[in-house]
Amino acid sequence: MKKIKIISFSVAYLILLTPIYASAMHIMEGFLPPLWAAIWSVISLPFIVGGFSKIKKITDESPNMKLLLGLVGAFVFVLSALKLPSVTGSTSHPTGVGLGTIIFGPLPMAVIGLIVLIFQALLLAHGGITTLGANVFSMAIVGPFAGYFIFKAIKDKNRSLAVFLAAMLADLITYIVTSLQLALAHPDAVNGIVGSFTKFMGIFAITQIPLAIGEGILTLIVYNLLVEYQKEGGFNLEKTH
């Protein structure tokens, strides 16, 4: 119990240190046309509903998982609030969704991501409410599902590599989707959607690849700490999804 309290305190401390003047999250308020903002919101809704159902099931079966859910949410909040300016209307930053995906599966991350993004929009002026659906879809839905599939595919062969790749891939896929969302909303005048997508991806790659690698390493460290706590009988990471 002592270890998880130390981890929780460390994450909370980092939240307090998160600069409130940091750039907006993936796509800033008003940067998407209303039609695209609505489309991404509608697409995201079923996953959010499914996520609430999954979280209820997890907490009903194991009430002590509430603390771990809170820790995962704080981890996402901190990492996704650390931003580097990238493309106009967007930024590069870790996503933090890999850890929760590995522990709880992808559906709960839709809810956790939604909550984190709302708090960032309202309290830190990161991103916005109109672009919430798009940001949830890229960071809290597609990213976690991509990370989950790679984790499940190789976890029995090499658990550490699976954790690292899941976190890294969840991060990178998020930015591929974000680039597509921006390209669909703002196609290039000459080369259309493909040209715009290529431009956004090219600029994102400069900062996002190193960030994704770093996130993979950090996620592996935190996961290993939780595994050590699991050995003390705190919870069973294998029965959360």
Curated annotation (Swiss-Prot):
The chain crosses the membrane at residues 30-50, 67-87, 99-119, 131-151, 160-180, 202-222. One of its GO terms (biological process) is cobalamin biosynthetic process. One of its GO terms (molecular function) is cobalt ion transmembrane transporter activity. Gene3D superfamilies: 1.10.1760.20. Residues 1-24 form the signal peptide. Keywords: Cell membrane, Cobalamin biosynthesis, Cobalt, Cobalt transport, Ion transport, Membrane, Signal, Transmembrane, Transmembrane helix, Transport. It is a multi-pass membrane protein. It comes from the Bacteria. It is found in: Cell membrane. Its main location: membrane. One of its GO terms (cellular component) is ATP-binding cassette (ABC) transporter complex. Pathway: Cofactor biosynthesis; adenosylcobalamin biosynthesis. Belongs to the CbiM family. This is Cobalt transport protein CbiM. It comes from Acetoanaerobium sticklandii (strain ATCC 12662 / DSM 519 / JCM 1433 / CCUG 9281 / NCIMB 10654 / HF) (Clostridium sticklandii). The gene is cbiM.
